[in-house]
Amino acid sequence: MELVVQFQVLNQSCQCLAWKPHPATAWGTESQHVVAGYSDGTMRVFSISRTEMELKMQPHAAALTAIAYSTDGEMILSGGRDGLVAVSSPRTGMTIRVLADHKGFPITVLQCTRKQYHDFGVEGGELWLATSSDQRVSVWASDWLKDKCELLAWLSFPAPAGPKGFGSLPPSLATFCPWDPDTLVYVGFGVQKEALFYNLRKKQVVEKISLPYFATSISLSPAAHFMAVGFDEQLLRLLHCPDGAAQDYAGHDDTVHLCRFAPSGRHLLTASHSAVLVWELTGS
């Protein structure tokens, strides 16, 4: 691995990053744009091929905590420490919508996925979710070109009274399930240490998988029914779904604060303090 380009913004901390999705006609080529969210509420779009910043926007007054491209790459969704979610166009540099449903609680996750246009009885070719640190998840259907954005589900997962301050609690995390597009998976501070599978059609939790600790990171394989979960206890667990068969892995010297499956599902990336580990799945 070698460093090919570096972008630096003086006096600001980069809080979140997202690659622009591949155009449907150019699958197999590497996306050449990334968007970065910063501690001053700005976000910047960088061109890798031209090694330059193409756009700077400030849709937030508070630090950005989560960022994602829409599935077609035409919009950028950003979430702030104040709980606001902004939708901005990288073509025009304008913020077209601000959603305040999670106001007051930092946004921890933003994720977009495709859907059939009239699926779930609402118009829009995209589903997206926002998760905030108060154990709440909102799911939306959108068609940004028609200025459509409709709330599909508002989920609140029960949790006991915890210590004051979100930084002392395990993060609230949610992700769409790659092998079941009607389902999302949630982990976070709660009554039990578990991963919850919530079905958007049935409007209920359809599966629970017990965990040894509260999760600090999660990723689902797009290629097989595997879920990777990281913990504060320097542990990585690989789970087969739905039976919950588990395999634990050591090798981290701190909290496993990030885990991401590669699109092929054959490799898993994990991060712990200053170390980045790459795992290869064999026999799966």
What are these regions (language model features)?
Residues 34, 76, 128-129, 184, ...:
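Hydrophobic beta-strand positions that form the internal "hydrophobic ladder"
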Residues 37-40, 79-82, 131-134, 187-191, ...:
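Conserved strand-to-loop turn within each blade of WD40 beta-propeller repeats
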Residues 1, 43-47, 85-90, 137-142, ...:
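WD40-repeat beta-propellers
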Residues 23, 30-31, 73, 116, ...:
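Conserved loop/turn motif of beta-propeller repeat scaffolds
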Residues 1-2, 51-52, 93, 145-147, ...:
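Short coil/turn linkers that define WD40 beta-propeller blade boundaries
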Residues 3-9, 53-59, 95-102, 150-157, ...:
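Short C-terminal beta-strands that terminate individual repeats in beta-propeller domains
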Residues 11-26, 62-69, 104-121, 161-177, ...:
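Canonical WD40 repeat/beta-propeller blade segments in eukaryotic WD-repeat proteins
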Residues 257-284:
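Blade-level signature of beta-propeller repeat domains, shared across WD40, Kelch, NHL, RCC1
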